[in-house]
Amino acid sequence: AGAKWLKDPDKIYHIVKEVTSVLDIPLTVKMRTGWSDSDLAVENALAAESAGVSALAMHGRTREQMYTGHCDHETLARVAKAITKIPFIGNGDVRSVQDAKLMIEELGVDAVMVGRAAMNNPYIFTQINRFFETGEELPELPFDKKLDIAEDHLKRLGDLKGEKIAVREVRGLAPRYLRGT
């Protein structure tokens, strides 16, 4: 909705400043590395930080790239180094514990945001958390456990939205859960 603002760090600053001035709760911002290139990534991130955002997430692709190509680790590392007052969350191509580890340990982000990979592996959050809490890398789930997750998702969604809607929604997700990464 606001990707065009990636061309104008001053606009980002003024909009974030205006929003934070009327909120009494934390505001987080997620942005891409840029519109068609990442030349303004650091400036955009610093604009949001100086305007009072509580945390910043950045997807390592430009708006033009959408979901093609690869996450721009170099740009995320530059932004991570520049952002010093708030948590910086890296996003893009986090499909495994090793991807999360690389972002945190090598790029210097404070946290990671998992996106599309969770559609194939909802267990990824448990795997990443366990690794950072204990150093243990959990193996891929066996098929029966994946089936349990799909069934639990169906039950919970049914409780929330009703059986008919839940079945329709889980029908598209269950094959991805069972197939895995």
Short names for language-model regions:
Residues 1-7, 58-68:
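Glycine-rich, proline-tolerant flexible connector loops at the mouths of alpha/beta enzymes
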Residues 29-33, 60, 90-92, 116:
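A cross-domain feature marking catalytic cores of carbohydrate-active enzymes
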